[in-house]
Amino acid sequence: MIHKHKTGINGFDIWVGEEMPSGNYLILGPPKVGKSIFVNQIAYLSALAKRPVVYVTLDGSPENIKWRMKEFNWDVEPFEKGNLFQFVDGFTFWYAYPQKRSSEFSVESLTNISKLLSVIVEAHNKTGSNGIIILNSLSTLLEHAEFQKSYSFMTGLKALTEERNCLGFAVLTSGMHPEMQINAFKHIVDGIIEMQFQTEKEKITRKIRFIGLGTRLNLLNWREFTITPDGIKLAPQMNEPQQRKNIQNSNPTPKKPNSTLHS
């Protein structure tokens, strides 16, 4: 039976029909459009709702990711202590001193795809069943491992999310990789959450769309979103049923941070 998940993001769950089915999803967009904020927000809100989270961090150390999340008042350290939130550190060995690794789960090489997958499985075993698995980012994996290895990894990650009824997200930066490679990843995932910048009447806005969610063809249309001190919020749609607009969102209202990082 396919498990269904809420992201907790303001406006997003209503847009996709309240819940997303288990599967592997690609988060695709240009630099600084909000991809990392999107997955960080999902990670925090999932743990807050007592859904297990495994966060594979290749673009920064776990400490750096936690610092960025705290900019939005998303503190995951209490969930780490309760084994509800596990980082898999694929960054520190490559870019910092190995002795500084603080995560229980880590990998020493991004070219050993089998090892990376096995460590993710170990981390997920500790958090429990279902839940969320985040890879941030697939672009960094491609920089270290050849395309075929990265594709094999995504095949393995897809199998893992299906076997364990997880919701998987892999972040990929557009403009960094050949179109053939991007299309190959689009082919293997269950859906694509695409983000972009758009210029309308000299005003730059952020837009999002969802490709590959069954018959919800209206999700192919671009929808505006903003990055606020509370995280990502989707702009209201005129055609949304009124009763859906009245559903109370589970996103808490954190204190306004001193600064935000739009990555």
Regions found by a protein language model. Name each.
Residues 166-167, 171-231, 239:
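Phosphate-binding/switch region of NTP-binding enzymes
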Residues 17-20, 45-49, 77-80, 122-127, ...:
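Conserved catalytic network of the ASCE P-loop NTPase/AAA+ motor domain
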Residues 94-156, 162:
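Phosphate-binding/switch loop-helix module in NTP-utilizing enzymes
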Residues 89-91, 137, 212-214, 236:
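Flexible glycine-/small-residue-rich
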Residues 52, 83-84, 129-132, 163-171:
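Loop/turn-to-beta-strand initiation segments
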Residues 6-18:
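Pre-Walker A adenine-sensing motif
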Residues 1-2, 217-263:
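C-terminal regions of RecA-like/P-loop NTPase motor modules
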Residues 15-89:
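Walker A/P-loop NTP-binding active-site region of P-loop NTPases
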